[in-house]
From Swiss-Prot:
InterPro entries: ATPase_NBD, Heat_shock_70_CS, HSP70_C_sf, HSP70_peptide-bd_sf, Hsp_70_fam. PANTHER family: HEAT SHOCK PROTEIN 70KDA (PTHR19375). Present with 6440 molecules/cell in log phase SD medium. NCBIfam families: PRK00290.1. Residues 608-649 are annotated as: Disordered. The gene is SSA3. It comes from Saccharomyces cerevisiae (strain ATCC 204508 / S288c) (Baker's yeast). The keyword Cell wall biogenesis/degradation does not apply. It holds the Pfam family HSP70. It comes from the Eukaryota. It is found in: Cytoplasm. One of its GO terms (cellular component) is cytosol. This is Heat shock protein SSA3.
Amino acid sequence: MSRAVGIDLGTTYSCVAHFSNDRVEIIANDQGNRTTPSYVAFTDTERLIGDAAKNQAAINPHNTVFDAKRLIGRKFDDPEVTTDAKHFPFKVISRDGKPVVQVEYKGETKTFTPEEISSMVLSKMKETAENYLGTTVNDAVVTVPAYFNDSQRQATKDAGTIAGMNVLRIINEPTAAAIAYGLDKKGRAEHNVLIFDLGGGTFDVSLLSIDEGVFEVKATAGDTHLGGEDFDNRLVNHLATEFKRKTKKDISNNQRSLRRLRTAAERAKRALSSSSQTSIEIDSLFEGMDFYTSLTRARFEELCADLFRSTLEPVEKVLKDSKLDKSQIDEIVLVGGSTRIPKIQKLVSDFFNGKEPNRSINPDEAVAYGAAVQAAILTGDQSTKTQDLLLLDVAPLSLGIETAGGIMTKLIPRNSTIPTKKSETFSTYADNQPGVLIQVFEGERTRTKDNNLLGKFELSGIPPAPRGVPQIDVTFDIDANGILNVSALEKGTGKSNKITITNDKGRLSKDDIDRMVSEAEKYRADDEREAERVQAKNQLESYAFTLKNTINEASFKEKVGEDDAKRLETASQETIDWLDASQAASTDEYKDRQKELEGIANPIMTKFYGAGAGAGPGAGESGGFPGSMPNSGATGGGEDTGPTVEEVD
């Protein structure tokens, strides 16, 4: 059976959770970590995802991709993409006006869209869940920042499809966190909760009213480009400048040194959340020069002061939009790793006149937790905890069409509860106008040129008539994912046309997605083949070394004779030497080599064990003989199942 999970697809870290038996389980990955770095690395031999990718970032900076969430659903000429591309050690290039990353993989130059990179992270989370649950996982609720626009949401949904998942729903991160906060507070009367969600790359503030299991979002605001990464950037720039001042060496173009500096900066930032000073020590950072310095919390706060202060603007905005005074907020819930920064906590507390934030939920796991609850609801879970739970979310940005003079005419104002449907009647601007161009925008500005164009379509075949006579009904329909459908109907002729906003500028076509799905399968198969190759290599290595250890046992030579012992020692050593020189050999080569070695070893080992009436005295110490006894087949060696034993007549 397939089980549904909740996935928090984060800028820097991702998290997966599952709801069953009235509780949410955050699922740890194969390293035992409850969050997984949103990193993908490409090498000459393999693709790495998660911890393994992040751990080798310093030695492979150009081919280690991170922060895909900062590129997803955006255009290449977006100023924020341009700024980010300067910081990234990997190459970001333009393809059809969209950003794609360029890396070297298995000796070839490859390009990947942000959707593909995100899909690789999602497939890692899917695999983590499957390993834990022991069953296939196809359905998922995936979270996005509340302030993500239509194309960013659509692109995230596409990433899920490429990863081979059915995305049940895209939900907003602060709303998911609110579920985590409110799930056990069913008996409490209506209260207003402000979710302050500052993560690795994005920032959201949502104000909700929670009453008996009904979670109603009143207003939302944020910045899809503000988070811990920006604080790290400030620290890296500061440390690089200090290194230059001390050594007269500029490391700004050395990606490996910058990566090591970034790792140290991130570690220092975390340390400063619990202590007022920390030291940074990096041996041989650049041209053999060490870098030792110390950093105080006050200095860090000064470096990021403007960024920290800017987090209060969205707080003021949601209060204004929901027409509430700060004194009417009952709980402030901090979500996202960056809310551990003491200065952020103090700013929020001071803004609310000294009110202490609620610390009842884990800031790293709350979003995945809420997503898992929503996944359970959408797949019909009958738990009493989720039965009366109702989520009423909102559209983060106003939606409308362009009317004469480039004016933005809003059909759905921001913070409208979704799903929602709204129609308005328009007419022609000129006499005998044969058609109209419906251009759909999102944003708050009066003129459309200052807003974001989502898509456009033609409604043609309007019969000749004076201006203002034809009646054209335009309908906006937002689904529960926050994704928009627009239709137009000319009343006189009944002619209609519609568009699901697929944002041709930022969205993948169906063919692209299908191609990426099949490529993802190919990469997955490559990964499995590589894992099999490494296993065959390790098996042979383990076998050869165990043979070598057995030869050194005191009784070995007297039981098998000098010649056989010498022959086995030579064969084992030759295999070990061959392995050292053949790190990139194929699976079959390793298996053939194992068979060869077994051909020499098995008769000798049979003699050794036979002479000792069962297991020789050294068998226990060396863990037993790990290879194959005669007729046990080549694959028996080195498996975790232990020695292969067969009955002797």
